[in-house]
Curated annotation (Swiss-Prot):
Subcellular compartments: Cytoplasm; Mitochondrion; Cell membrane
Ranges for domain YrdC-like: 65-255
Role played: Cytoplasmic and mitochondrial threonylcarbamoyl-AMP synthase required for the formation of a threonylcarbamoyl group on adenosine at position 37 (t(6)A37) in tRNAs that read codons beginning with adenine. Catalyzes the conversion of L-threonine, HCO(3)(-)/CO(2) and ATP to give threonylcarbamoyl-AMP (TC-AMP) as the acyladenylate intermediate, with the release of diphosphate. Participates in t(6)A37 formation in cytoplasmic and mitochondrial tRNAs. May regulate the activity of some transporters.
Region of interest: Disordered: 22-60
Lipid bilayer topology: Peripheral membrane protein
GO terms of biological process kind: negative regulation of transport; regulation of translational fidelity; tRNA threonylcarbamoyladenosine modification
Pfam families linked: Sua5_yciO_yrdC
Species whose genome carries this gene: Bos taurus
Name the record gives this protein: Threonylcarbamoyl-AMP synthase
PANTHER family: SUA5, THREONYLCARBAMOYL-AMP SYNTHASE
EC numbers: 2.7.7.87
InterPro entries (alphabetical): DHBP_synth_RibB-like_a/b_dom (IPR017945), Sua5-like_dom (IPR006070), TC-AMP_synthase_SUA5 (IPR050156)
MF terms (GO), sorted A to Z: double-stranded RNA binding; L-threonylcarbamoyladenylate synthase; nucleotidyltransferase activity; tRNA binding
């Protein structure tokens, strides 16, 4: 397995290399980086251009690129960043930085026996970080999309990421900003929902404001979903694909029916149980 990479004390160097100025928490790096409202003056908020930032958005490339560069700089420095996805708001960090992984668990109050998913930018990247035992067409029919695919992990992943399981959940959100971010970052991102453990998931940045003081950067992509039905807070559908020829539903999530239909089109049979 890949060793953990150093990630402490790099923020100023990385920020300079990305063309960003380094300043105290809450300071503006440009006209688009805004001081967050009280009671969380330590948080920094960066709003994406346009209304929403999902697959249907037509972003202004200048502001879009600025947001990507700012997020990549923080992630490479070992920070935890709040991001919009196609299902919920999430917390992201470098999956190769053990200190950052620990910070995510502390911020959420999450048990370290619960796994973090890995977010990638392209289907081709899945083969680097997983031992894939399903047809490529199946992956492309499900990804990008509101699903987490659980497969056997490869030795490329940090040994401190979910050390209690040989499996890993893979996400490629159907969200333009997240795909661009993962590709620009150039490595696996650990991803989990932006909320305290056991509390409701978040569809806008205000709903996890209690976490802001513990985050380096908050990417505000606007509201996700309609916010009215309980189904919109279910998160991704989590599917175990670690057993050849079978699939197991770990979490029904928001796309159970369509996901199950695709799996069965490829001849996979339902099974029970998973160690992820």
């Amino acid at each position: 397995m890949s060793p953990a990479r150093p990630c402490r004390g790099l923020r100023a160097v990385v920020a300079a290399s990305m063309g960003l100025s380094e300043g105290p928490a809450g300071s503006a790096r440009s006209g688009r980086l805004l001081r967050s409202p009280s009671p969380t003056p330590g948080a920094r908020l960066l709003r994406l251009p346009g209304s929403g930032a999902g697959r249907a958005a037509n972003p202004e490339r200048g502001g879009w690129t600025e947001a990507l560069r700012a997020a990549v700089a923080e992630l490479r420095a070992g920070a935890v960043v709040a991001v919009p996805t196609d299902t919920l708001y999430g917390l992201a960090c470098s999956a190769s930085c053990s200190e950052a992984l620990g910070a995510v668990y502390r911020v959420k109050g999450r048990s370290e026996t619960k796994p973090l998913a890995v977010c990638l930018g392209r289907v081709a990247d899945v083969y680097r970080y997983c031992h894939v035992r399903v047809p490529e067409g199946l992956l492309k029919d499900l990804l990008p999309g509101p699903v987490t695919l659980v497969m056997e992990r490869s030795e490329e992943l940090n040994k401190d990421l979910n050390p209690f399981t040989p499996l890993v959940g893979i996400r490629i959100p159907d969200h333009a900003f997240m795909q661009d971010l993962a590709q620009m970052f150039g490595g696996p991102l650990a991803l989990t929902s932006a909320n305290l453990s056991s509390q409701s998931s978040s569809l806008n940045v205000e709903e996890f404001q209690d976490l802001w003081p513990h985050l380096s950067l908050i990417i505000d992509g606007g509201p996700i979903g309609d916010g009215q039905s309980p189904e919109c807070r279910l998160g991704s559908t989590v599917v175990d694909l670690s057993v050849p020829g079978k699939f197991g539903i770990i979490r029904p999530g928001c796309a159970l029916e369509s996901t199950s239909a695709i799996l069965q089109e490829y001849g996979l049979l339902p099974s029970h149980g998973s160690c992820w």
